[in-house]
Structure formats: structure tokens, C-alpha cells
């Protein structure tokens, strides 16, 4: 636990320069219940759709989600998809997008039609130009990349063969990075590994490895033998072959191969799992992890990623839960730091069909009355979010002498309780804005309120939710406890 937490803290201090093919992933969810009368083709009744930053952009988002800083260089067209991608990346606090616009090509866009019920892909439509970038665009890409290398702890090239990573771009970046003493990880697409000559690590999947080496890759010995030949050919330090449910095998230039089995996972969607592996390897190695530690973290992250729909990111809290399934979630991971983090947790819970509950208060001095309400609230839902008044909010409501404990202390006490799954601090006098964002299925307050007095009851009722009032425990009040303490009584 301590070593893993130290690794996460180190990751948060790293910077990755990520270069690669950016694409817009769109997922259209629906069901097929009939055949078109116009042609023998299924008709999809669309229920919802969503967009995600895909390709190398998904690598960048995973790097940022793990707490590292990512300087991302990619290519877009002068179109709506490109503008959407630019806006999405720019909205990420830890991503610094340096996107080159090429009006002569469309932004790569992939639309997947997915069964909402079975989570299976029915059709994919692609808009793309895979031709290599022109000499002018190539130079603009290099200018952007080379100007940022000194800031990097590690460089990651994510090749989807859509024109960004030309032979010249790859060779120039690897040479420049090596001169600066920066390691370079490549997630390759080309079957000619020689174009990545001089990289630190290549991370092909099994299919890419078999195509490039003409090796059957049916055993670890076969993989090791073929990888050593490829390492010599590409002049790299190591090769890591990902093998889906069979785990991943790393073959170093010197030393014994390392195999890490795949972690168990309920597979919903494998889109972007390779991006997650590359991102975790990069940040872990940049943070000082050895090969084995980086691989175990990457394997755990891949298991989390494939359990989600669409191209998804993995958070430190999710990674911790996967690596340490029997350990309690650390209290600090229950305290939400941003709206984006809250949205990620909510999306994860809703994908799993979990019932989300909400209650709120100042919780200045935690007492048995609070514990009763929190325990009852947790019993009425699968995940409980506690809205906590900020210090400024408490002062406005209770007076200048309150709170007794600051908001961080109050949040840590609440987060240490087993009944509490998340703590969200709000600045307003009421949690209405927070409730509107969360849209809980259950809204809980003490029985000293009426249903109509509970802030947000209309929002919950409108969505078919429940407002639950818990009988208060007589004799317990924070105000009376504070007064007794000041009077010196017990």
C-alpha cells in the first residue's frame, strides 16, 4: 500500500510528451428490433450517443487522469470534429494540447453503433485519411515536439498509422530525446520495427508482434526468441508484447523475460485498452518504477478499462481498488476535488447500475446523531455522497465562531466512515447546485425536517427518486456540544 501510494505521488510530479494520431470516437447506443423495408439491413433505434477523445488523445487523457501532466502533439483537420477535439483536450487541466491543423485532410472520426443491452458492436463507420503528413505539416509537428522535449520526463509515441508519425518525425524525435537523456516508449503500428530504431521500449500487441516478426507467439519462449531478434533489429532496450486475456510479456535486451498475467475483469469494451496500457507504463516508468511494477500497474489499469463502455480513462482510485482489492479506499480518495472527478465517479457507478444516495450538512463535531443518519442513508442506497458546507458557508449559517474544525478536517473525518463513499464540499448556502449535478436516487435528511423543507426534493421527485427522513437521535446537537465545551460542562 505505502509503495503504491508513493508511486502515485511520484506520478503526479511527472510530465509526459505524447505524440500521435488523434481521433474522435463516437458511440451510438441503441437496439435492433426490425429489418428495414428498404433493404435487408437492420434498423437501429438510437437511444443515446456520446463522444470521446480517441487514439493518441485517449493516451493523453489517461496520462492526465493518473495525475501526470501531458504535453500532447497531434494533427486535426479544419472541421467540426477537429474543433471538438481541441475543445475537449483544452478542457483537461493536466493536458497541454499543441494541435497542428491541416485543412487538406479530415479529422479522423470513428462512429461505433453499439447494442445498449448487450454492449456489442454492430457497425463502425470511419472518416479518415491515412496518408503521411505533407512536408510542411511534418515540419510544423516537429517544431511543436522538439520545443517541448526538455520539459519531459519521458516521451510516448502512439502510432495509429494515420499520418502523424512519419519516418522522419519518428527518427528526429527519438534522436533528439536520446541526446537529452529522455526515454522513449512507442506503441507501434508499423510492421517494420526498424522505423522506431533507438526507442527505449516498443509495446506491440500480439497481432502486431506476429505480423512484424513472423513468429507464432504460442509460448513465452517463442516470444522471447523473436523479441530478442526484433530488439537487435530496432536497437531498443526492451519489447513488451500485450496478449489480451493472456497478460503481457516483457523481453529486455539484457536479463530474463517478465510475464504478468491478465487480471480478472468483466469485459464490456476493449476500445482503447492498449492506450491505457501505454499511458500507465509511461507514467510509472517516468516516476521511477521498475519494469515489473510498471507492468503490474498497466495490467490492473487494462482490467479496469475493458470493464467500461467506450474509450475510458482510469483514475488512481480505480487503480488502487484493482491492485489492492482487499484494502479500504483511502479516506483522501473519497474527498472530491473537482466537478470532473465527481462526474467520473458518478459515470462509473451508473454504468454498474448502482443506486446513488445524497445527504448533507456542516458536520462540525461528528456525534452519534450524525452517525445514525449517515448509516441509515447508506443502507438506503449502494453509494452515499455527503455534501459538506465549506468554512465560508458554515460561517454564514452558524456565525463567525463556527466552524470549530476547518472543512478539510471535517471532510477527512467523514471520509473515514465506512458508510460514506464520497465527500463533496460546496461553497453555497444550500447544496441545490450539487444535487442538480448528482441527480441522486435517494435524498436523505434528519427527521427534524419536513419533506418540503428538504433542499432539492423537487429535483429528486421529478426523476422518480425518494426523499427519506431519518428520525433524529435526541440529546445530540453540534451547537449544544460547542456550548457545553465553552462552559466547561459535560
Curated annotation (Swiss-Prot):
ATP binds at residues 205-208. GO terms for cellular component: cytosol. The active site is at 275. Its EC number is 2.7.1.167, 2.7.7.70. Residues 1-330 are annotated as: Ribokinase. It catalyses: D-glycero-beta-D-manno-heptose 7-phosphate + ATP = D-glycero-beta-D-manno-heptose 1,7-bisphosphate + ADP + H(+); D-glycero-beta-D-manno-heptose 1-phosphate + ATP + H(+) = ADP-D-glycero-beta-D-manno-heptose + diphosphate. It holds the Pfam family CTP_transf_like. GO terms for molecular function: ATP binding; heptose 7-phosphate kinase activity; heptose-1-phosphate adenylyltransferase activity; phosphotransferase activity, alcohol group as acceptor. Keywords: ATP-binding, Carbohydrate metabolism, Kinase, Multifunctional enzyme, Nucleotide-binding, Nucleotidyltransferase, Transferase. One of its GO terms (biological process) is ADP-L-glycero-beta-D-manno-heptose biosynthetic process. The keyword Nucleotide-binding applies. Pathway: Nucleotide-sugar biosynthesis; ADP-L-glycero-beta-D-manno-heptose biosynthesis; ADP-L-glycero-beta-D-manno-heptose from D-glycero-beta-D-manno-heptose 7-phosphate: step 1/4; Nucleotide-sugar biosynthesis; ADP-L-glycero-beta-D-manno-heptose biosynthesis; ADP-L-glycero-beta-D-manno-heptose from D-glycero-beta-D-manno-heptose 7-phosphate: step 3/4. Residues 358-490 are annotated as: Cytidylyltransferase. The keyword Kinase applies. Catalyzes the ADP transfer from ATP to D-glycero-beta-D-manno-heptose 1-phosphate, yielding ADP-D-glycero-beta-D-manno-heptose. In the N-terminal section; belongs to the carbohydrate kinase PfkB family. Homodimer. This is Bifunctional protein HldE. It comes from Rhodopseudomonas palustris (strain HaA2). The gene is hldE.
